[in-house]
Curated annotation (Swiss-Prot):
PANTHER family: REVERSION-INDUCING CYSTEINE-RICH PROTEIN WITH KAZAL MOTIFS, SERINE PROTEASE INHIBITOR. GO terms for biological process: blood vessel maturation; canonical Wnt signaling pathway; embryo implantation; embryonic forelimb morphogenesis; extracellular matrix organization; negative regulation of cell migration; negative regulation of extracellular matrix disassembly; negative regulation of metalloendopeptidase activity. A lipid is attached at S942 (GPI-anchor amidated serine). Interacts (via knot repeats) with WNT7A (via disordered linker region); the interaction is direct. Interacts (via knot repeats) with WNT7B (via disordered linker region); the interaction is direct. Interacts with ADGRA2; the interaction is direct. Interacts with MMP9. This is Reversion-inducing cysteine-rich protein with Kazal motifs. Knot repeats lie at residues 37-84, 104-141, 151-197, 216-263, 292-338. It is found in: Cell membrane. Its main location: membrane. Disulfide bonds join C633-C658, C635-C654, C643-C671, C716-C735, C724-C750, C761-C787. Expressed in various tissues and untransformed cells. It is undetectable in tumor-derived cell lines and oncogenically transformed cells.
Length: 971
C-alpha cells in the first residue's frame, strides 16, 4: 500500500512539474475539485493551506516548489487527499505498455549494462549494474522517456494518438518534424494538454543541441570562419539554417576532406543516432573526479583512477580492477572520500523517507544520499540479505535469519549504507567497527564464514575504525529523531535538488520583492567539468581543473562560458607535490598539517605555511607571562590605527611592521577615514568612486587600489541595484546616486534602523557609519561606537583592552559563545581561521585578469557553499594574517537548532578545505586555501549566555536579523 501511495504521489509531482495545469484564479471555488480534495485535510490546517495553494497557484515554478514541500505537511498516511489530488487530474493512472527505457539500451557503454537494460522492467533493475557516473547518455534517455510517457497518458483510450506520442519518446534520436506533425494531427482534438506537454520536450530536446558541436569550429583553418561558426551554432536551431550559415560565413562548400566539415559529418554519423560524439574535452572526462586521483596512496589506484576519468573511457576491466583494488580499500580513504564528494556531496537535512524513517527530521545532520531511490535501495538490500548472504565486491558474508536476529539493527545498517550519513569533519560514511563486530557475532552464520575469517577480520575490511570522528554509530538510527516534525526552524531549499540536470541550485538570499511570494532558491545556468561529469559550476566563474592527461600537480584555469562549456583554459605551472618540508629535523610531506606551539602549520609543495600567533609555552618565564600581550611581536595594546597598502587597518604601527609592512607602506589613520578620491586620480571624463577592499595578493605585483574610475554617463541604465546615500535617500543604482551629486553610505535598500548614522565597530577593527554599511562589506558588528580597542587574540591575553567596551547581550538560547580574534564581544557562530598560499593567489591573479584577489571574493565564494538560509557568511583578514570566516545565524532570536546548523556548515567547510576537496578547490580562488581551524558555539543546557549588558543590548540583535535579511542580496 505504501508503495502504491508513493507511486501515486510521484506521478502527481511529475505530472504537474512537466505539464501545464489549469489553475484557479483567486481562492478555491466551493464544490471545485480542489476544494473537495482539500476538505480531506480539514483536521490538519497546515496541510489544508498547502493544498489550497497547490490548486490556486498561477506559477508553474511556484507549483513545483509547493509539491516538493507538500509531503512535509500532508504525510503519506493521509491517503484520501493524495488519491483525490491524483484522481482530479487526467492521465495519471494510465501506465504505458512495456518499459519506456527499452529504446535507450543501445546507448549503454558497458556490455553488461546493455544486457541488463534489455531485460529490465524499471530503472531500479539496472541501478546495480549500470554506473550513473559514466552511463550518462543512457540514464538521461531513460529519465526523459519516463517523463515523456506522462505526456502520452493524456491520450487515454485513443490508440493512434497514444502510439504516435510514444514513438517520439521511445526513440533515442531527436524526433523529426514528421513525427511531431503526426502527434499534432492525431492528438490536437483529443488533448491540448498532451500537445503542450510534447511541445515542452521537443522544443528543448537536448540530444541535438547545436552548441554540442562548438568544438568543431576550432578545426576551421580561417579565423573568420571560426568566429562565424561559433556565432551560427549559438544562434541557429535547425540543421538547414546551420549549413546555409556555415557556407555563407566560411565562403566554402561542404567538402569531406575539409577538417571543419569532416568534424560535423563524424558527429552526425554517430554509432548512436542522436548522440553527439565529443572529442575528449580539455578537462578530461570528469575534471572533478580527476582531481581526486592525486590523493591515491598507491600507484595502482592512482593510475586506474586517472585512466577512468582522463581522456578516454576506461574499459570494463579497468572498472572491475578499480572496484577490486581501490573502491573498498581503507588505505585509499582520502581518494574515495574525495570521489564521494563529487558524486554525492554531504548535505544538511533528511526527510520524507518512507522506509528508513529513523533518518527523517534531522535538519542539522549531514547525508550524502537522502532520497527516494536510496530509501528504496535500502528496502531492496534487506530483501536480498534475508536470503542468507550479504554479497560484497570482495567477500560474501553468510548470515542467519535477519528477520528474527536483530532486524532493526540490520535495517539501520541497510539504511546507513544507502542514505550515507556523513561526519561534518571527516565526511566519512562507514559504520563503526564495534557495531559491525557485534552484529556479525550475533547474526553472522559463523560456520559458513570464508576460510580464515572471523567477525573481527571481516569488519577490519569493512569498518576498520571505532573513532567517532570517522565512523557512524548505528545507535543514532535505531530510534526516530527527537525533533519530531519541528523542522521549519532550519530549511534546505536546494536539498533535494529542485533544478534541471544542467543547472545549479543556489539559495535565494534576496528575499521576495515587495513581499510577493517567490521561491527560496534560484536555478542558474552552469557548466559540467567534462563529458561524463555531473559536477556543475556557475556560469561566468573561473574554475581550476587538473590537466586532462592527469599529471599530478598540473592544473589549468578555465572559465564557464555562456555556451555551457568550459573555455579559455590557461595552463598553470605544475606544482611539485613530491617536495617536502623539514621542520625540527623531521620531514613533512606535501599536504601534512601539524602544530608548532600554538600555531597551526601546513607543508605546501615544499613551502611551510604557518599562522603567526604569539605563543606562551609551559617553559615561559614569569617575566614572559607578565609582559605577554598576545599581539604579534608582543606589541603593546595601544590603539593608534594605521592603514596598510593592502587596505587593512592595523591597530598600531608596531603590528603593521610585524606583519611585514615597511614604513612607506602604511599611513596613520584607519583606511575608512581616508578619501581615495582626494586628490582625484581619474581622468576628466571619468568619475572616481571609492571602493574599499582588503587584498590578499602581493601589493607590489597587483596593487590594491581603493577606488575605481567609471565613465561619466549622461543617462544612467535603469538596472535595479539599490543603494543608499549619506542622507538616507535610496537610488536605483550607483550611477543615479553619483549623477545626483550624492555620496554612498552603503549598498542595498535604505533601512529604517540605519537612518541614524551611529557608528559601529566591525570585527575587522574598522569603524563603519552604520550597521548596514558594515554588513554591505560582509563584516559583522562587534559593538556600537567607534573602534577603540585592539581586541582579544589569545586565551592568555589580558581582557583590559576591552574594558571600556560595552558589549550587547546575547539573545540566543543554549549557546556558549566564541570571541573572534581581534574582537571584544562574544558571538554565537561557527568560526573558521584559514591559512592560504599567497604564491598560489599571485599565480592565479597573474594567469587570469592581473587584478588583486580580495577577502570579499573569498567570502562570496564560500557563501555559495552554505546551504541553510538561516545562516550567512561574514569575515575579515585578521592581524595574524588569517582569513577569519564567520557563519552566523540571521534570525532576530536564533534558536539552538539554527546555531547548530551554522556550526555544522562551518565544520563541513573546514573539512572541505583541509582535505583539498574539489567541492571547494575547483573554484578559483578557493583553491589557494590550505588549512582551516574551526571553533563553534557549543550548546549549553541553560537558556542563554549573557555578556555585559548595555543600552544597545536589544537593538543590535534586532538590527542584525533585519539587515541580514534585507541586505544579503546586494553583496
Amino acid at each position: 500500500m505504501a508503495t502504491v501511495r508513493a507511486s501515486l504521489r510521484g506521478a502527481l509531482l511529475l505530472l504537474l512539474a512537466v505539464a501545464g495545469v489549469a489553475e484557479v484564479a483567486g481562492g478555491l471555488a466551493p464544490g471545485s475539485a480542489g476544494a473537495l480534495c482539500c476538505n480531506h485535510s480539514k483536521d490538519n490546517q497546515m496541510c489544508r493551506d498547502v493544498c489550497e495553494q497547490i490548486f490556486s497557484s498561477k506559477s508553474e515554478s511556484r507549483l513545483k516548489h509547493l509539491l516538493q514541500r507538500a509531503p512535509d505537511y500532508c504525510p503519506e498516511t493521509m491517503v484520501e487527499i493524495w488519491n483525490c489530488m491524483n484522481s482530479s487530474l487526467p492521465g495519471v493512472f494510465k501506465k504505458s505498455d512495456g518499459w519506456v527505457g527499452l529504446g535507450c539500451c543501445e546507448l549503454a557503454i558497458a556490455l553488461e549494462c546493455r544486457q541488463a537494460c534489455k531485460q529490465a522492467s524499471s530503472k531500479n533493475d539496472i541501478s546495480k549494474v549500470c554506473r550513473k557516473e559514466y552511463e550518462n547518455a543512457l540514464f538521461s534517455c531513460i529519465s526523459r522517456n519516463e517523463m515523456g510517457s506522462v505526456c502520452c497518458s493524456y491520450a487515454g483510450h485513443h490508440t493512434n494518438c497514444r502510439e504516435y506520442c510514444q514513438a517520439i519518446f521511445r526513440t533515442d534520436s531527436s524526433p523529426g518534424p514528421s513525427q511531431i506533425k503526426a502527434v499534432e494531427n492525431y492528438c490536437a482534438s483529443i488533448s491540448p494538454q498532451l500537445i503542450h506537454c510534447v511541445n515542452n520536450y521537443t522544443q528543448s530536446y537536448p540530444m541535438r543541441n547545436p552548441t554540442d558541436s562548438l568544438y568543431c569550429c576550432d578545426r576551421a583553418e580561417d579565423h573568420a570562419c571560426q568566429n562565424a561558426c561559433k556565432r551560427i551554432l549559438m544562434s541557429k536551431k535547425t540543421e538547414m539554417e546551420i549549413v546555409d550559415g556555415l557556407i555563407e560565413g566560411c565562403k566554402t562548400q561542404p567538402l569531406p576532406q575539409d577538417p571543419l566539415w569532416q568534424c560535423f559529418l563524424e558527429s552526425s554519423q554517430s554509432v548512436h543516432p542522436g548522440v553527439t560524439v565529443h572529442p575528449p574535452p580539455s578537462t578530461g572526462l570528469d575534471g572533478a573526479k580527476l582531481h581526486c586521483c592525486s590523493k591515491a596512496n598507491t600507484s595502482t589506484c592512482r593510475e586506474l583512477c586517472t585512466k577512468l576519468y582522463s581522456m578516454s573511457w576506461g574499459n570494463t576491466q579497468s572498472w572491475q580492477e578499480f572496484d577490486r583494488f581501490c573502491e573498498y580499500n581503507p588505505v585509499e580513504v582520502s581518494m574515495l572520500t574525495c570521489l564521494a564528494d563529487v558524486r554525492e556531496p554531504c548535505q544538511l537535512g533528511c526527510r520524507n523517507l518512507t522506509y528508513c524513517t529513523n533518518f527523517n527530521n534531522r535538519p542539522t545532520e549531514l547525508f550524502r544520499s537522502c532520497n527516494a531511490q536510496s530509501d528504496q535501495g535500502a528496502m531492496n538490500d534487506m530483501k536480498l540479505w534475508e536470503k542468507g548472504s550479504i554479497k560484497m565486491p570482495f567477500i560474501n558474508i553468510p548470515v542467519l535469519d535477519i528477520k528474527k536476529c536483530q532486524p532493526e539493527m540490520w535495517k539501520a545498517i541497510a539504511c546507513s549504507l544507502q542514505i550515507k550519513p556523513c561526519h561534518s569533519k571527516s565526511r566519512g560514511s562507514i559504520i563503526c567497527k564495534s557495531d559491525c563486530v557485534e552484529i556479525l557475532k550475533k547474526c553472522g552464520d559463523q560456520n559458513k564464514f570464508p576460510e580464515d575469517h572471523t567477525a573481527e577480520s571481516i569488519c577490519e575490511l569493512l569498518s576498520p575504525t571505532d573513532d567517532l570522528k570517522n565512523c557512524i554509530p548505528l545507535d543514532t538510527y535505531l530510534r526516530p529523531s527527537t525533533l519530531g516534525n519541528i523542522v521549519e526552524e532550519v530549511t534546505h531549499p536546494c536539498n533535494p535538488n529542485p533544478c534541471p540536470a544542467n543547472e545549479l541550485c543556489e539559495v535565494n538570499r534576496k528575499g521576495c520583492p515587495s513581499g510577493d511570494p517567490c521561491l527560496p532558491y534560484f536555478c542558474v545556468q552552469g557548466c559540467k567539468l567534462g563529458e561524463a561529469s555531473d559536477f556543475i559550476v556557475r556560469q561566468g566563474t573561473l574554475i581550476q581543473v587538473p590537466s586532462s592527461a592527469g599529471e599530478v600537480g598540473c592544473y589549468k584555469i578555465c572559465s564557464c562560458g555562456q555556451s555551457g562549456l568550459l573555455e579559455n583554459c590557461m595552463e598553470m605551472h605544475c606544482i611539485d607535490l613530491q617536495k617536502s618540508c623539514i621542520v625540527g629535523g623531521k620531514r613533512k610531506s606535501h599536504g601534512t598539517s601539524f602544530s608548532i606551539d600554538c600555531n597551526v602549520c601546513s607543508c605546501f609543495a615544499g613551502n611551510l605555511v604557518c599562522s603567526t600567533r604569539l605563543c606562551l609555552s609551559e617553559h615561559s618565564s614569569e617575566d614572559d607571562r607578565r609582559t605577554f600581550t598576545g599581539l604579534p611581536c608582543n606589541c603593546a595594546d595601544q590603539f593608534v590605527p594605521v592603514c596598510g597598502q593592502n587596505g587593512r587597518t592595523y591597530p598600531s604601527a608596531c603590528i603593521a611592521r610585524c606583519v611585514g609592512l615597511q614604513d612607506h607602506q602604511f599611513e596613520f589613520g584607519s583606511c575608512m577615514s581616508k578619501d581615495p578620491c582626494n586628490p582625484n586620480p581619474c581622468q576628466k571624463n571619468q568619475r572616481c568612486i571609492p571602493k574599499p577592499q582588503v587584498c590578499l595578493t602581493t601589493f607590489d605585483k597587483f596593487g590594491c587600489s581603493q577606488y575605481e574610475c567609471v565613465p561619466r554617463q549622461l543617462a544612467c541604465d535603469q538596472v535595479q541595484d539599490p543603494v543608499c546615500d549619506t542622507d538616507h535617500m535610496e537610488h536605483n543604482n550607483l550611477c543615479t546616486l553619483y549623477q545626483r551629486g550624492k555620496s554612498l553610505s552603503y549598498k542595498g535598500p535604505c533601512q529604517p534602523f540605519c537612518r541614524a548614522t551611529e557608528p559601529v565597530c566591525g570585527h575587522n577593527g574598522e569603524t563603519y557609519s552604520s550597521v548596514c554599511a558594515a554588513y554591505s562589506d560582509r563584516v559583522a558588528v562587534d559593538y556600537y561606537g567607534d573602534c577603540q580597542a585592539v581586541g582579544v587574540l589569545s586565551e592568555h591575553s589580558s581582557v583590559a583592552e576591552c574594558a571600556s567596551v560595552k558589549c550587547p547581550s546575547l539573545l540566543a538560547a543554549g549557546c556558549k559563545p566564541i570571541i573572534p580574534p581581534g574582537a571584544c564581544c562574544p558571538l554565537c557562530a561557527g568560526m573558521l581561521r584559514v591559512l592560504f598560499d599567497k604564491e598560489k593567489l599571485d599565480t592565479i591573479a597573474k594567469v587570469t585578469n592581473k587584478k588583486p584577489i580580495t577577502v570579499l571574493e573569498i567570502l562570496q565564494k564560500i557563501r555559495m557553499h552554505v546551504s541553510v538560509p538561516q545562516c550567512d557568511v561574514f569575515g575579515y583578514f585578521s592581524i595574524e594574517s588569517e582569513i577569519v570566516i564567520l557563519i552566523i545565524p540571521v534570525d532576530h532570536y536564533p534558536k539552538a537548532l539554527q546555531i547548530e546548523a551554522c556550526n555544522k556548515e562551518a565544520e563541513k567547510i573546514e573539512s572541505l578545505i583541509n582535505s583539498d576537496s574539489p567541492t571547494l578547490a575547483s573554484h578559483v580562488p578557493l583553491s589557494a586555501l590550505i588549512i582551516s581551524q574551526v571553533q563553534v558555539s557549543s550548546s549549553v543546557p541553560s537558556a542563554g549566555v549573557r555578556a555585559r549588558p548595555s543600552c544597545h543590548s536589544l537593538l543590535l540583535p534586532l538590527s542584525l536579523g533585519l539587515a541580514l535579511h534585507l541586505l544579503w542580496t546586494y553583496n
